Amino acid sequence: LAANLIPLFKVHVPPREELLPALEATLYSGQVGQGPRVEEFEAALAPVLGNRNVLAVNSGTSALQLALRLAGVRGGSVVTTPMTCAATVLPVLAEGARPVWADIDPATGNIDPLDAERKLQADTRAVLAVHWGGQPCDMGALMGLGARHGVPVIVDAAHALGAQWAGEPVGSPAADFTCFSLQAIKHITTIDGGILTTRDAGDYRRGKLLRWYGIDRDAEQADARVGADIPEWGYKFHMNDVAATIGVAQLAHLPQVLKA
């Protein structure tokens, strides 16, 4: 009987003959922190997400906090949904903002755009929606709300890797910021990790700095261990090459994971 049980919660891991040689190459390359494998993973994600502005980070929660920082929510309020994991809302508090609850659509569990608009306040800095259960929110209505009131729209798409809205992948510039999780129980995992996509190239460039202390890793400057020019302080949110190696291997299996 035990042999016939369906492993409902078994984590997807690529075949060992694919994954282990790739991991071995990374582990013994001399570079296991943020490096070429992270860049490779981001480049591989771009066509999957329909967006060239892709930042790999160390968790979905970090992706959300980075998006909230880029949106400038500190000192204001964020209209969001109570129908979500605590990890959606904790970054709002971490960024010094106040969550304001909007009602949900009882048919989908997603945030109700009409009630979200009613809940806007003078100090509202962003709307934070969740694609509940992987079913996309009404992005047309939410982005319309954002455009009317000058408020950026952030999407927690932890459940929605591979989903589409209006024929475009979730992660495309249909939202100002889209955040994914690569934690252990998501569609694909990098053991832990996250992804942030941005609509605006300027937000992407700023986010690239803020995910690693605020230091420009691409600039020609003195060794950051002895001196660095940091115009704006940042976080330690970057992904490492070991996680990215797993991510690259996992992406090849995403279509079959989505069909399962």
Task: Kindly give the residue locations of the regions a language model identified.
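Generic structural signal for small/hydrophobic residues in well-ordered secondary structure
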Residues: 22-23, 45, 63, 78-79, ...
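Conserved coil-to-alpha-helix start sites within the AMP-binding
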Residues: 83-89
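Active-site phosphate-binding strand-loop segment of PLP-dependent enzymes
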Residues: 107-190, 195-203
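Active-site region of PLP-dependent enzymes
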Residues: 160-167, 173-260
